[in-house]
A protein has these predicted regions:
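Glycine-rich helix-loop "coupling/hinge" segments at transmembrane-helix boundaries
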Residues: 182, 210, 258-295, 314, ...
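Transmembrane alpha-helices
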Residues: 193-197, 230-263, 290, 306
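Short cytoplasmic-facing helical segments at TM-TM junctions of multi-pass membrane proteins
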Residues: 159-160, 202-249, 272, 276
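Generic hydrophobic transmembrane alpha-helix motif, especially the helices
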Residues: 165-202, 209
Length: 323
Protein backbone atom coordinates (compact mmCIF):
# COMPACT_ATOMS: atom_id res chain seq x y z
CA UNK A 1 0.00 0.00 0.00
CA UNK A 2 1.43 3.39 -1.00
CA UNK A 3 2.18 6.05 1.58
CA UNK A 4 -0.39 8.41 0.06
CA UNK A 5 -3.09 5.74 0.16
CA UNK A 6 -2.36 5.14 3.87
CA UNK A 7 -2.43 8.87 4.49
CA UNK A 8 -5.76 9.24 2.70
CA UNK A 9 -7.30 6.35 4.63
CA UNK A 10 -6.07 7.60 8.01
CA UNK A 11 -6.99 11.25 7.62
CA UNK A 12 -10.16 10.38 5.73
CA UNK A 13 -11.35 8.10 8.53
CA UNK A 14 -10.63 10.78 11.14
CA UNK A 15 -12.43 13.44 9.09
CA UNK A 16 -15.49 11.25 8.53
CA UNK A 17 -15.58 10.31 12.22
CA UNK A 18 -15.39 13.93 13.39
CA UNK A 19 -17.97 15.27 10.96
CA UNK A 20 -20.23 12.27 11.57
CA UNK A 21 -19.98 12.86 15.32
CA UNK A 22 -20.75 16.53 14.77
CA UNK A 23 -23.88 15.69 12.78
CA UNK A 24 -24.98 13.26 15.50
CA UNK A 25 -24.44 15.89 18.20
CA UNK A 26 -26.48 18.44 16.24
CA UNK A 27 -29.40 16.08 15.69
CA UNK A 28 -29.44 13.86 18.77
CA UNK A 29 -27.94 15.69 21.76
CA UNK A 30 -30.51 17.90 23.54
CA UNK A 31 -29.93 21.63 23.87
CA UNK A 32 -29.16 23.14 27.25
CA UNK A 33 -31.77 25.31 28.95
CA UNK A 34 -31.50 29.03 28.29
CA UNK A 35 -29.43 28.73 25.13
CA UNK A 36 -30.47 30.56 21.98
CA UNK A 37 -31.61 27.97 19.47
CA UNK A 38 -32.60 27.83 15.81
CA UNK A 39 -33.79 25.16 13.35
CA UNK A 40 -31.03 22.61 12.75
CA UNK A 41 -32.35 21.30 9.42
CA UNK A 42 -30.32 23.70 7.22
CA UNK A 43 -27.12 22.97 9.15
CA UNK A 44 -27.75 19.21 9.05
CA UNK A 45 -28.39 19.39 5.30
CA UNK A 46 -25.14 21.26 4.70
CA UNK A 47 -23.09 18.86 6.84
CA UNK A 48 -24.79 15.83 5.29
CA UNK A 49 -24.08 17.07 1.78
CA UNK A 50 -20.49 17.73 2.81
CA UNK A 51 -20.12 14.19 4.14
CA UNK A 52 -21.48 12.74 0.89
CA UNK A 53 -19.05 14.90 -1.06
CA UNK A 54 -16.14 13.87 1.16
CA UNK A 55 -16.93 10.17 0.77
CA UNK A 56 -17.13 10.55 -3.01
CA UNK A 57 -13.84 12.45 -3.03
CA UNK A 58 -12.17 9.76 -0.94
CA UNK A 59 -13.41 6.98 -3.23
CA UNK A 60 -12.03 8.75 -6.29
CA UNK A 61 -8.73 9.52 -4.55
CA UNK A 62 -8.20 5.97 -3.27
CA UNK A 63 -8.93 4.60 -6.73
CA UNK A 64 -6.00 6.61 -8.14
CA UNK A 65 -3.78 7.66 -5.21
CA UNK A 66 -1.17 9.22 -7.50
CA UNK A 67 -3.62 11.38 -9.44
CA UNK A 68 -4.47 15.05 -9.19
CA UNK A 69 -7.66 14.37 -7.23
CA UNK A 70 -5.75 12.40 -4.59
CA UNK A 71 -3.05 15.07 -4.28
CA UNK A 72 -5.66 17.79 -3.84
CA UNK A 73 -7.51 15.80 -1.17
CA UNK A 74 -4.31 14.86 0.68
CA UNK A 75 -3.39 18.54 0.82
CA UNK A 76 -6.78 19.57 2.24
CA UNK A 77 -7.59 16.67 4.56
CA UNK A 78 -5.78 18.08 7.63
CA UNK A 79 -7.86 21.25 7.32
CA UNK A 80 -11.03 19.19 6.90
CA UNK A 81 -10.14 17.30 10.09
CA UNK A 82 -9.41 20.55 11.90
CA UNK A 83 -12.75 21.96 10.75
CA UNK A 84 -14.61 18.92 12.06
CA UNK A 85 -12.94 19.20 15.45
CA UNK A 86 -13.55 22.95 15.59
CA UNK A 87 -17.27 22.69 14.80
CA UNK A 88 -17.71 19.79 17.21
CA UNK A 89 -16.11 21.78 20.04
CA UNK A 90 -18.13 24.85 19.03
CA UNK A 91 -21.43 22.97 19.17
CA UNK A 92 -20.66 21.24 22.45
CA UNK A 93 -19.47 24.40 24.20
CA UNK A 94 -22.45 26.57 23.22
CA UNK A 95 -25.96 25.26 22.71
CA UNK A 96 -25.30 21.74 24.05
CA UNK A 97 -23.65 22.64 27.36
CA UNK A 98 -23.85 26.40 27.86
CA UNK A 99 -20.15 26.51 28.69
CA UNK A 100 -19.78 29.67 26.61
CA UNK A 101 -22.28 32.23 27.83
CA UNK A 102 -25.00 33.53 25.51
CA UNK A 103 -25.61 35.99 23.91
CA UNK A 104 -21.92 36.44 23.16
CA UNK A 105 -21.52 32.91 21.80
CA UNK A 106 -24.12 30.93 19.85
CA UNK A 107 -24.26 27.73 17.82
CA UNK A 108 -23.67 27.63 14.04
CA UNK A 109 -27.36 27.07 13.26
CA UNK A 110 -28.17 30.44 14.84
CA UNK A 111 -25.70 32.16 12.52
CA UNK A 112 -27.26 30.40 9.53
CA UNK A 113 -30.73 31.53 10.61
CA UNK A 114 -29.55 35.13 11.04
CA UNK A 115 -27.83 35.01 7.65
CA UNK A 116 -31.07 33.87 6.02
CA UNK A 117 -33.08 36.55 7.84
CA UNK A 118 -30.69 39.38 6.94
CA UNK A 119 -29.52 38.26 3.51
CA UNK A 120 -31.21 41.17 1.70
CA UNK A 121 -29.60 43.81 3.92
CA UNK A 122 -26.26 41.97 3.85
CA UNK A 123 -26.35 41.79 0.05
CA UNK A 124 -27.05 45.53 -0.11
CA UNK A 125 -24.20 46.23 2.32
CA UNK A 126 -21.86 43.95 0.37
CA UNK A 127 -22.63 45.75 -2.90
CA UNK A 128 -22.20 49.12 -1.20
CA UNK A 129 -18.81 48.13 0.22
CA UNK A 130 -17.75 46.66 -3.11
CA UNK A 131 -18.69 49.80 -5.02
CA UNK A 132 -16.98 52.11 -2.54
CA UNK A 133 -13.86 49.94 -2.51
CA UNK A 134 -13.78 49.71 -6.31
CA UNK A 135 -14.16 53.47 -6.69
CA UNK A 136 -11.48 54.38 -4.19
CA UNK A 137 -9.10 51.54 -5.05
CA UNK A 138 -9.14 52.22 -8.79
CA UNK A 139 -8.68 55.97 -8.34
CA UNK A 140 -5.91 55.49 -5.77
CA UNK A 141 -4.11 52.84 -7.82
CA UNK A 142 -4.21 54.94 -11.00
CA UNK A 143 -3.00 58.00 -9.09
CA UNK A 144 -0.26 55.94 -7.45
CA UNK A 145 0.79 54.50 -10.79
CA UNK A 146 1.08 57.95 -12.37
CA UNK A 147 2.90 59.36 -9.35
CA UNK A 148 5.33 56.45 -9.16
CA UNK A 149 5.96 56.47 -12.91
CA UNK A 150 6.76 60.17 -12.87
CA UNK A 151 9.13 59.78 -9.91
CA UNK A 152 10.80 56.72 -11.34
CA UNK A 153 11.35 58.10 -14.82
CA UNK A 154 11.94 61.83 -14.25
CA UNK A 155 14.53 63.07 -11.79
CA UNK A 156 12.89 66.50 -11.76
CA UNK A 157 9.51 65.01 -10.85
CA UNK A 158 11.19 62.82 -8.26
CA UNK A 159 12.81 65.88 -6.69
CA UNK A 160 9.41 67.45 -6.03
CA UNK A 161 7.21 64.43 -5.46
CA UNK A 162 9.40 62.07 -3.46
CA UNK A 163 9.57 64.30 -0.33
CA UNK A 164 5.78 64.59 -0.49
CA UNK A 165 5.48 60.81 -0.74
CA UNK A 166 7.85 60.33 2.20
CA UNK A 167 5.98 62.86 4.34
CA UNK A 168 2.31 62.22 3.60
CA UNK A 169 2.38 58.60 2.45
CA UNK A 170 3.11 56.89 5.79
CA UNK A 171 0.21 58.69 7.51
CA UNK A 172 -2.58 56.16 8.21
CA UNK A 173 -5.50 56.75 5.88
CA UNK A 174 -7.96 56.64 8.76
CA UNK A 175 -6.17 59.57 10.43
CA UNK A 176 -7.13 61.78 7.49
CA UNK A 177 -10.84 61.02 7.75
CA UNK A 178 -11.74 64.13 9.84
CA UNK A 179 -9.90 66.34 7.34
CA UNK A 180 -11.56 64.60 4.40
CA UNK A 181 -15.02 65.13 5.90
CA UNK A 182 -14.29 68.86 6.21
CA UNK A 183 -12.73 69.36 2.78
CA UNK A 184 -14.57 66.94 0.49
CA UNK A 185 -18.16 67.97 -0.42
CA UNK A 186 -20.00 64.77 0.61
CA UNK A 187 -19.39 62.06 3.19
CA UNK A 188 -19.44 59.38 0.49
CA UNK A 189 -16.71 61.14 -1.49
CA UNK A 190 -14.70 61.62 1.69
CA UNK A 191 -14.93 57.86 2.32
CA UNK A 192 -13.84 57.18 -1.27
CA UNK A 193 -10.92 59.58 -0.79
CA UNK A 194 -9.75 57.69 2.30
CA UNK A 195 -9.89 54.38 0.43
CA UNK A 196 -8.03 55.92 -2.52
CA UNK A 197 -5.35 57.31 -0.23
CA UNK A 198 -4.82 53.84 1.22
CA UNK A 199 -4.13 52.46 -2.26
CA UNK A 200 -2.08 55.42 -3.50
CA UNK A 201 0.98 55.20 -1.26
CA UNK A 202 1.92 51.51 -1.80
CA UNK A 203 1.27 51.76 -5.53
CA UNK A 204 3.34 54.92 -5.91
CA UNK A 205 6.22 53.52 -3.84
CA UNK A 206 6.42 50.19 -5.65
CA UNK A 207 5.98 51.72 -9.12
CA UNK A 208 8.80 54.16 -8.45
CA UNK A 209 11.03 51.35 -7.20
CA UNK A 210 10.18 49.17 -10.19
CA UNK A 211 10.89 51.86 -12.77
CA UNK A 212 14.11 52.86 -11.01
CA UNK A 213 15.30 49.23 -11.06
CA UNK A 214 14.95 48.80 -14.84
CA UNK A 215 18.39 47.67 -16.09
CA UNK A 216 20.15 50.54 -17.83
CA UNK A 217 21.23 48.16 -20.58
CA UNK A 218 17.58 47.68 -21.63
CA UNK A 219 17.15 51.42 -22.09
CA UNK A 220 20.49 51.84 -23.88
CA UNK A 221 19.72 49.07 -26.37
CA UNK A 222 16.27 50.50 -27.09
CA UNK A 223 17.68 53.99 -27.62
CA UNK A 224 20.37 52.61 -29.91
CA UNK A 225 17.59 51.11 -32.04
CA UNK A 226 15.87 54.50 -32.25
CA UNK A 227 13.25 54.25 -29.52
CA UNK A 228 11.72 57.49 -28.27
CA UNK A 229 10.75 58.45 -24.74
CA UNK A 230 7.19 57.23 -25.13
CA UNK A 231 8.32 53.83 -26.39
CA UNK A 232 10.85 53.51 -23.58
CA UNK A 233 8.22 54.20 -20.95
CA UNK A 234 5.43 52.07 -22.45
CA UNK A 235 7.46 49.14 -23.81
CA UNK A 236 10.52 48.99 -21.56
CA UNK A 237 10.00 50.66 -18.17
CA UNK A 238 6.42 49.60 -17.42
CA UNK A 239 6.76 45.91 -18.44
CA UNK A 240 10.02 45.62 -16.51
CA UNK A 241 8.43 47.21 -13.42
CA UNK A 242 5.27 45.09 -13.62
CA UNK A 243 6.21 42.67 -10.77
CA UNK A 244 6.80 45.59 -8.39
CA UNK A 245 3.62 47.31 -9.53
CA UNK A 246 1.55 44.19 -8.84
CA UNK A 247 3.10 44.01 -5.38
CA UNK A 248 1.95 47.59 -4.90
CA UNK A 249 -1.57 46.62 -6.00
CA UNK A 250 -1.62 43.75 -3.52
CA UNK A 251 -0.37 45.89 -0.63
CA UNK A 252 -2.68 48.72 -1.63
CA UNK A 253 -5.68 46.41 -1.55
CA UNK A 254 -4.94 45.50 2.06
CA UNK A 255 -4.58 49.12 3.14
CA UNK A 256 -7.67 50.11 1.14
CA UNK A 257 -9.74 47.45 2.88
CA UNK A 258 -8.56 48.72 6.26
CA UNK A 259 -9.41 52.29 5.23
CA UNK A 260 -12.79 51.12 3.93
CA UNK A 261 -13.72 49.66 7.30
CA UNK A 262 -12.91 52.94 9.04
CA UNK A 263 -14.58 55.14 6.43
CA UNK A 264 -17.84 53.20 6.56
CA UNK A 265 -18.22 53.85 10.27
CA UNK A 266 -18.75 57.58 9.71
CA UNK A 267 -19.03 58.28 6.02
CA UNK A 268 -21.83 56.06 4.68
CA UNK A 269 -25.14 54.55 5.75
CA UNK A 270 -24.60 51.14 4.13
CA UNK A 271 -21.68 48.73 4.06
CA UNK A 272 -20.29 45.70 5.83
CA UNK A 273 -18.44 47.70 8.48
CA UNK A 274 -21.54 49.83 8.99
CA UNK A 275 -23.64 46.67 9.40
CA UNK A 276 -21.23 45.14 11.92
CA UNK A 277 -21.14 48.34 13.98
CA UNK A 278 -24.93 48.75 13.74
CA UNK A 279 -25.81 45.29 15.03
CA UNK A 280 -23.11 45.54 17.70
CA UNK A 281 -24.82 48.68 18.95
CA UNK A 282 -27.96 46.61 19.50
CA UNK A 283 -25.91 43.90 21.25
CA UNK A 284 -26.94 41.45 18.51
CA UNK A 285 -23.68 39.53 18.58
CA UNK A 286 -24.77 36.59 16.37
CA UNK A 287 -25.54 39.01 13.54
CA UNK A 288 -22.21 40.72 14.21
CA UNK A 289 -20.47 37.37 13.68
CA UNK A 290 -22.45 36.86 10.47
CA UNK A 291 -21.25 40.24 9.21
CA UNK A 292 -17.67 39.36 10.11
CA UNK A 293 -17.92 36.06 8.22
CA UNK A 294 -19.28 37.82 5.12
CA UNK A 295 -16.49 40.40 5.41
CA UNK A 296 -13.83 37.70 5.69
CA UNK A 297 -15.17 35.88 2.63
CA UNK A 298 -15.30 39.19 0.73
CA UNK A 299 -11.69 40.08 1.57
CA UNK A 300 -10.39 36.60 0.76
CA UNK A 301 -12.19 36.57 -2.58
CA UNK A 302 -10.60 39.89 -3.53
CA UNK A 303 -7.13 38.68 -2.57
CA UNK A 304 -7.57 35.44 -4.52
CA UNK A 305 -8.72 37.35 -7.62
CA UNK A 306 -5.77 39.73 -7.40
CA UNK A 307 -3.28 36.90 -7.03
CA UNK A 308 -4.87 35.05 -9.95
CA UNK A 309 -4.38 38.20 -12.03
CA UNK A 310 -0.79 38.43 -10.84
CA UNK A 311 -0.08 34.80 -11.71
CA UNK A 312 -1.60 35.30 -15.16
CA UNK A 313 0.37 38.45 -15.95
CA UNK A 314 3.63 37.04 -14.56
CA UNK A 315 3.32 33.53 -15.96
CA UNK A 316 6.74 34.02 -17.58
CA UNK A 317 8.47 34.70 -14.25
CA UNK A 318 10.40 31.81 -12.72
CA UNK A 319 9.89 30.78 -9.08
CA UNK A 320 6.74 32.88 -8.81
CA UNK A 321 5.04 32.44 -5.45
CA UNK A 322 1.49 31.26 -6.17
CA UNK A 323 -1.58 32.02 -4.07
Amino acid sequence: MSARRRLLRLWGAIALALWGAYLAVVLLLPDTAGARTAPTAPLAAIVGAGLVGLVSWLVLALDRPTGTVARALAHRLPWIVFGGGWFLAWQLSTVKSGLLDPPYFVAPEVLIADLVDDWTLLATCLMSSGLLLLTGYVIGSVAGFITGLLMGWSRRADYWLHPLLQTVGPVPASALLPLAVLVVPTTYLSAAFIVAFGAWFPMATMTRAGVRSVPKSFIDVARTLGAGEGFLVARVAIPSALPDMLTGLFTGLGTSLAALMTAELVGVDRGLAWYINWVKGWADYPRMYVGLVVLIVFCRALMVLLFKLRSSLLAWQQNLVRW
